[in-house]
Design a protein with these regions (language model features):
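Cysteine-dependent hydrolase recognition
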Residues: 15-417
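Sec-dependent N-terminal signal peptides
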Residues: 2-13
């Protein structure tokens, strides 16, 4: 640890921060508007430079948490990889942990999972104590773009689109029976959790589905849907680090969405949250920026993304997805980071008192590869899914009962009774 970092760390002892930010010094000026805005909201913030090894950083977080007030951890910077071999590049990054994988390796995943989860676990019990988010900026320009999006998002007036979910379903490919079971479970989860006053707009990659766009129009439809305002944009399907699943097209097979499409996105304020329930789309340790990273740092991309760093599995995806929706729409924590933290904690628990979870467990025993270890599968999915974005982001909830409140429509203002 360098002398500057040591002095700053010792100074924390006298403070009682609720938010710790790990930020390279080169990014501080780009972060300044965010810091000022959050402090005006009442947050006590400590900002420290990154360290070379995750174990060192974890010890620093534990020291700051001794105040007993720490709730949020914001990591500013990408994960170092082979491309960041030079010291000047590595000092702009924040390291991550690598934990052994035992379950998803049966589906072809790597032997380790890239994960920021240990930073959230202050008492080493395997459950997150902090709400953690990583803003994967490679340079001050990208961080400034993210900060501008955050400020626009939180300052925008309520809109009709705040009650809209846009959902894209890819092809299953696990076998006809498993695909049918997974699709039925996903629809049941949506019915049980999404408020009835929400509009759910669907696009399907299955050409026989009534939600399928005209032939050859799937990719443009998805880009337009993602560019539209809404509470969240959710993708359910296969993925790779830089793209979603590939589907038949006039020129062969092309991705439903890729990093090449990101510059053309025009997400209208307030930008939606992107939830990518898929393999690899959040692989922030890959040699190049993954799809979720590109979406988040783009000026006109989604406000944040929840995505996985490794191969995901149907059961783990379904449980974590269910708990995300339940936390968001039933518990309604104020911030995005606390939505994910609550969902992670519930995913790790057996939740026998919840009527949906035993049903999902029963279905999983019929489709998961033997030997079945549902608890271990849930742990791995909690480890690999991350929030790429600001954990302090205040979500745009619309009150279920709004009296004489003016809500802005997409093109006009309407009065909600």
């Amino acid at each position: 640890m360098n002398c500057t970092a040591l002095v700053l760390l010792l100074a924390v002892t006298a403070a009682a921060p609720d938010t710790l930010v790990i930020c390279p010094s080169e990014f501080r000026s780009a972060l300044a508007p965010w810091e000022e805005y959050r402090r005006r909201q009442g947050h006590e913030i400590v900002i420290l430079p990154p360290l070379d090894r995750p174990e060192q950083l974890q010890a620093t977080i534990a020291h700051v948490a001794q105040s007993g007030t720490l709730k949020h951890l914001v990591l500013i910077g990408d994960v170092p990889n082979a491309a960041a071999m030079y010291a000047a590049q590595r000092q702009l990054t924040v390291p991550t942990h690598y934990r052994p994988a035992n379950i998803n390796t049966r589906w072809g995943s790597e032997p380790t999972i890239a994960t920021d989860m240990p930073y959230a676990d202050l008492d080493s019990d395997g459950t997150p104590d902090l709400a953690v988010g990583r803003i994967p900026a490679d340079n001050p320009h990208e961080l400034a773009a993210v900060v501008r999006k955050i400020l626009r998002y939180e300052r925008a007036p309520p809109r009709n689109s705040d009650r809209r979910l846009n959902v894209v379903s890819g092809a299953g490919g696990f076998g006809a029976l498993t695909d049918m079971i997974v699709e039925a479970a996903a629809r049941q989860v949506m019915r049980q959790t999404v408020p009835k006053d929400f509009e759910v707009r669907r696009i399907s990659a299955n050409p026989t589905s009534p939600d399928s766009p005209p032939p050859g129009q799937l990719r443009p439809y998805i880009c337009r849907q993602l560019s539209a305002s809404g509470f969240a944009w959710i993708y359910l399907g296969h993925g790779r680090p830089t793209e979603l699943d590939r589907v038949p097209a006039a020129t062969g097979r092309e991705p439903m969405l890729s990093v090449d499409d990101v510059p053309g996105l025009r997400c209208t304020a307030p930008c939606p949250l992107a939830v990518l329930v898929a393999c690899y789309t959040g692989a922030f340790d890959a040699d190049r920026d993954c799809l979720a990273e590109e979406l988040v740092v783009a000026e006109n991309g989604p406000i944040a993304a929840v995505a996985a760093t490794r191969v995901t599995m149907p059961y783990g995806n379904t449980v974590l997805g269910y708990e995300l929706l339940r936390a968001c729409f039933h518990d309604r924590p104020a911030t995005l980071g606390d939505v994910l933290r609550l969902a992670q904690s519930r995913t790790l628990a057996s939740a026998a008192d919840d009527p949906m979870r035993p049903s999902l467990d029963g279905l999983a025993r019929g489709i998961s590869p033997p030997p079945v270890d549902l608890a271990a599968e849930r742990r791995e999915h909690v480890a690999m899914y991350h929030l790429l974005g600001d954990p302090l982001l205040r979500l745009r909830y619309v009150a279920e009962e709004v009296a004489d409140a003016s809500i802005q429509a997409d093109e006009e203002t309407v009065t909600v009774k």
